[in-house]
């Protein structure tokens, strides 16, 4: 195996940059003759690269596995197993292979690993005394060749159904790259679908839920779209556009994401978006790309065709004035949307816009509260509440608002409206709330919760409970005095388990969640596996446990 690996290295050094990808809008070129599909199934996807997810851009391709598990997963190319990961949610079970051509492939949600990998993982779990492990391997520790079976497909972790999540990453930068740009194409002759457009009246004001907006239905099919109600749009001032769009392939009915969107005015490109590659620290900035307030209010996904000043994503190859159009010359203009999937199938929509004449000094809304700047440290202080937001954690300037609401039953503080849920933040921020004096001995059990049920576990900090929420909203202090629950499934005191494969429990918590759990047999730590979806904790008997009477102890 190692001999073949060395020969392959030589071939790559000769050819990997001579055969380059030719495709849609992209800033880089990628080798085309190296990677194979990771499954021996006709390629069909349930999720596309870069498609819109709840709080991130999808980072790979989700290959379908006929709604079942157990298909062999193959190494996409020669390389070495560089990382193994087991986690409750996320990918569940994941394998990382580093290749000599500068890329790393990732295989997520697999059911089982090879026996050699299983042993390494088990040894690491016992070493760390943890079910969740994430560790790296030496380059010569576990070599693989293209096509080697490395796992069986599964449904582990935060997976909505059996499939294989597959990624190609830049080994050096760790950016994830669209796998279809490497020639791993999916049969696709279907152009994207456009269902509506959005029009935003910006006029120099920060983007928010108060930004005037309107949505217009779209009619058409097979790549040609128009407004459902034909009209010339009368627009004046600084305007941003958006649209609702999805894409399908020829082999799957799933509604996935598009690859690129280009906005032109009178033939001139003003804005371009393309899901070629991105860094993982940018993925939460999906909330700067979409109309986040509209999603929170109506669950409608609208992709904005203009860029917020604090946006962190590198998916905009080209833009003029951040895609914001000034309509103030009194002329009629053609506005064209050009939407493509990664296969190059194209859909277009053309609008006629009659421009008005904007006032020399368009009115700018006065802040309703404290003006926070997206590129500066922002702080707010009152006698009961403090907060601090680091630079870059907002996507635009913010007219921050704050209010004190009545104390809720069982709460140990008033409820504080920390702005509102319609404005996203990129990362956690610091929030301090002062509890009522009666909290006393319960201070170490205090947590900060929001009225929508989200939890920000707190800690005592100089008279305040400090937490780090990742959203704005209405927050208050509660105390968590109820211990987690443990419900035995197939075990009881004195039970005879000679014929059983293991012991099973259900565990849960009513507020702050499960932090740790520890299982012991006769005082020795044993590996307990937590199933994220079924909420079942299990210990599987193995040769380490001799027949006879044993004492099992579980601490949660």
Mark where each language-model region is.
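Bacterial Sec-dependent N-terminal signal peptides
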Residues: 1-31
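Proteolytic processing hotspots in large secreted/extracellular or virion-associated proteins
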Residues: 360-363, 368-374, 400-447, 491
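Surface-exposed, glycine-biased beta-strand/turn segments
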Residues: 21-104, 111-116, 131-133, 137-140, ...
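Short edge beta-strand/loop segments characteristic of extracellular beta-sandwich folds
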Residues: 242-246, 432-436, 502-510
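Long, low-complexity serine/threonine/glycine- and acidic-rich segments characteristic of extracellular
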Residues: 115, 145, 187, 202-208, ...
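Short, solvent-exposed loop/linker segments at the N-terminal edge
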Residues: 225, 231-236, 423-425, 493-499
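Proteolytic-maturation and junctional protease-sensitive modules
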Residues: 419-475, 516-518, 525-526
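Proline-enriched interdomain boundary motifs that mark the N-terminal boundary
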Residues: 191-196, 483-490
């Amino acid at each position: 195996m190692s001999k073949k690996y060395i020969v392959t290295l030589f071939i790559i050094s000769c050819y990997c940059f001579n055969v380059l990808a030719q495709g849609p809008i992209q800033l880089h070129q990628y080798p085309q003759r190296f990677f194979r599909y990771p499954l021996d199934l006709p390629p069909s996807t349930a999720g596309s690269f870069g498609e819109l997810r709840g709080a991130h851009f999808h980072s790979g391709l989700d290959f379908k596995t006929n709604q079942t598990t157990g298909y062999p997963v193959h190494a996409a190319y020669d390389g070495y197993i560089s990382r193994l990961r087991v986690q409750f949610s996320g990918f569940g079970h994941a394998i990382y292979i580093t290749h000599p051509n500068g890329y790393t492939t990732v295989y997520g949600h697999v059911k089982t690993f090879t026996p050699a990998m299983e042993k390494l993982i088990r040894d690491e779990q016992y070493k760390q005394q943890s079910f969740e492990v994430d560790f790296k391997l030496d380059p010569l520790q576990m070599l693989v060749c293209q096509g080697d079976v490395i796992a069986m497909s599964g449904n582990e972790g935060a997976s909505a159904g059996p499939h294989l999540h597959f990624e190609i990453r830049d080994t050096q930068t760790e950016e994830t790259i669209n796998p279809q740009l490497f020639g791993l194409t999916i049969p696709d002759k279907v152009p994207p679908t456009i269902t509506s457009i959005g029009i935003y009246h910006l006029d120099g004001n920060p983007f928010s839920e108060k930004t005037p907006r309107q949505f217009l239905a779209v009619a058409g099919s097979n790549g040609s779209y128009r407004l459902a109600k034909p009209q010339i749009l009368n627009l004046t001032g600084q305007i941003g556009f958006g649209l609702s769009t999805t894409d399908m392939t020829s082999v799957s009915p799933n509604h996935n994401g598009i690859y690129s969107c280009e906005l032109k005015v009178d033939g001139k490109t003003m804005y371009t978006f393309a899901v070629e590659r991105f860094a993982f620290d940018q993925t939460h900035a999906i909330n700067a790309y979409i109309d986040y307030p509209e999603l929170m209010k109506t669950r409608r996904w609208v992709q904005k065709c203009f860029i917020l000043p604090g946006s962190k994503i590198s998916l905009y190859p080209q833009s003029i004035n951040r895609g914001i159009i000034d309509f103030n010359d009194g002329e009629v203009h053609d506005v064209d949307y050009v939407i493509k999937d990664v296969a190059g199938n194209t859909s277009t929509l053309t609008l006629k816009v009659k421009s008005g004449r904007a006032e020399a000094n368009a009115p700018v809304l006065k802040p309703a509260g404290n003006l926070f700047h997206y590129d500066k440290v922002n702080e707010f202080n009152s006698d009961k509440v403090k907060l601090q937001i680091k630079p870059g954690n907002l996507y635009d300037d913010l007219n921050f608002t704050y209010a004190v609401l009545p104390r809720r039953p069982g709460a140990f503080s008033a409820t504080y409206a920390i702005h509102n849920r319609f404005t996203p933040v990129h990362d956690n921020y610091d929030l301090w709330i002062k509890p009522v004096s009666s909290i006393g001995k319960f201070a170490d059990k205090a947590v900060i919760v929001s009225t929508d049920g989200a939890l920000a576990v707190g800690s005592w900090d100089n008279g305040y409970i400090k937490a780090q929420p990742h959203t704005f909203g209405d927050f208050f202090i509660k105390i968590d005095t109820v211990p987690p629950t443990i419900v035995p499934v197939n075990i009881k005191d004195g039970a005879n388990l000679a014929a059983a494969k293991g012991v099973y429990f259900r565990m849960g918590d009513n507020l702050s969640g499960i932090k740790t759990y520890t299982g012991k047999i006769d005082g020795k730590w044993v590996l307990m596996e937590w199933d994220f979806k079924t909420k079942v904790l299990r210990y599987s008997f193995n040769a380490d446990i001799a027949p006879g009477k044993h004492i099992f102890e579980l601490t949660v």
